[in-house]
Structure formats: structure tokens, C-alpha cells
Design a protein with these regions (language model features):
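A generic structural signal for ordered secondary structure
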Residues: 8, 14-16, 77-79, 115-117
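Short, intrinsically disordered low-complexity segments
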Residues: 1-3, 10, 59-62, 71-73
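Unchanged
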Residues: 33-57, 64-115
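Residue-level signal for pocket-adjacent positions within structured domains
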Residues: 21-23, 28, 59, 81, ...
Length: 117
């Protein structure tokens, strides 16, 4: 099972979600850790590589293992002043989700966000 550094970025009551190219569902930004890389460092690195956003503040908040998931999510709350922009060919799009609109998303998105509220 791989370790995934997962970012939660809030702004104006919305959370940042991304959709990989060729996928139908949205997820929280993040990605796998490199060899011996801390999960929060991976979350920060992926946010910058994929969306050009630099963390102003980061806090690792919890770890989540979900049944049926191929990843262990190590979740960090990230604060940034940067606006997202697509920089990585792996991503198709990003959205600021109000957590109310019915959008296609992976179940871990709801499970992680429920732990924060």
C-alpha cells in the first residue's frame, strides 16, 4: 500500500479539488511520497508541482486508511495565498468546491472532510 500526502486547502468556505486527466471523479490534491519523504513534504511538493501553489503554513492533521483504497492518506491542512493554475499534464482541471454541489468525487474526499467538521 502506498503512502499518499493529501492536501486540504480551504478558501472562502470552499475546498480545492482536482481531477486527473481521463478520470471522472474529483479528489483532494496530493500524491505519493518519494523514498523517505515525509508525507507533509509530499503534499506540499505535489501542490506546487501540479498547481503552482506554495504553502504559507502546513499542519499534518491525521492519517486515514479507507477500505478498498490503494493508498494510506496522510492528510495535511495547507494555507496558501497563491491562486491555483494547471502546471501538470496529469491534471485535467481543478475547482473550488462549496461542499454542497453534487459533483462526482472519490469517497475519500467526503470521509476526510467529515473528520475536519
Amino acid at each position: 500500500m502506498r503512502i499518499r500526502g493529501t492536501s486540504v486547502v480551504f478558501r472562502d468556505g470552499k475546498v480545492l479539488l482536482v481531477r486527473d486527466r481521463g478520470k471522472l471523479k474529483f479528489s483532494l490534491p496530493g500524491g505519493g511520497t518519494h523514498h523517505h519523504e515525509p508525507s507533509m513534504a509530499a503534499a506540499i511538493r505535489e501542490l506546487h508541482e501540479e498547481l503552482g501553489m506554495r504553502a504559507r503554513k502546513a499542519e499534518r492533521i491525521f492519517r486515514c486508511d479507507f477500505e478498498g483504497s490503494q493508498s494510506k492518506h496522510k492528510v495535511s491542512l495547507i494555507e496558501t495565498d497563491d491562486e491555483p493554475r494547471l502546471r501538470d499534464k496529469e491534471l485535467e482541471e481543478f475547482i473550488w468546491w462549496d461542499m454542497k454541489a453534487d459533483i462526482p468525487r472519490f469517497s475519500h474526499v467526503d470521509q476526510i472532510l467529515e473528520k475536519l467538521t
